[in-house]
A protein has these predicted regions:
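Active-site rim elements
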Residues: 7-11, 92-97, 139-140
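Amphipathic, well-ordered alpha-helical segments in soluble domains
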Residues: 18-21, 25, 55, 103, ...
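Solvent-exposed, charged/polar functional surfaces in cytosolic regulatory/catalytic domains
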Residues: 21-28, 106-113, 149
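Short, contiguous alpha-helical
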Residues: 35-81, 108, 119-163
Length: 163
């Protein structure tokens, strides 16, 4: 993946690939395997999915506000804090993956009608130090870039479970 800024098409491709890739990787595993950590200090596949859902919630809501409002002010929320307000870690993997995939389909549908200039829409983000100006492109790119190594993490976990 390029180290610079991703194009809109690259972002959309990466976002579309995540949920089906996770589904393919985890096909055939039983719930106990998906909830088992390969090592004591590591996440299970379910923990990784819960984290991805939390990030999608937080950054997806920022994206929605940026699209809906002109130059809004958004209070930063850490996905690690947000996950504590959910039951994502306790959910069964397959229904959780289905919810994640549905959320992703909905997000991609929101992006579909956007003009290229809409990706430059901004928000001022507060609550994490000095206020920062972030774009729709920034949030979408964070989501896409952040997800990729976690999908690889799920692949490593699954390979361990299948040994």
């Amino acid at each position: 993946m390029p180290s610079g800024s991703l194009t809109i098409e690259q972002i959309l491709t990466l976002l579309a690939e995540g949920p089906p890739r996770i589904a393919t990787l985890t096909a055939g595993l039983v719930p106990a395997q998906l909830h088992t950590s390969p090592n004591p200090d590591e996440w299970s596949a379910n923990d990784v999915l819960a984290h991805l859902r939390s990030c999608a919630d937080v950054w997806g809501s920022c994206i929605a506000v940026i699209i809906a409002e002109d130059t809004p002010t958004i209070r930063a929320v850490n996905p690690t804090t947000w996950i504590k307000k959910t039951d994502y870690r306790e959910l069964e993997f397959q229904p959780s993956l289905h919810a994640f995939a549905t959320q992703r389909t909905d997000l991609l549908a929101v992006f579909e009608p956007l003009a290229p200039e809409d990706w430059s829409r901004t928000a001022t983000v507060t609550g994490a130090g000095k206020p920062l100006v972030r774009t729709l492109h920034t949030y979408a790119q964070w989501l896409a870039r952040h997800e990729r190594p976690h999908v690889k993490q799920i692949e490593r976990i699954v390979n361990t479970m299948r040994m």
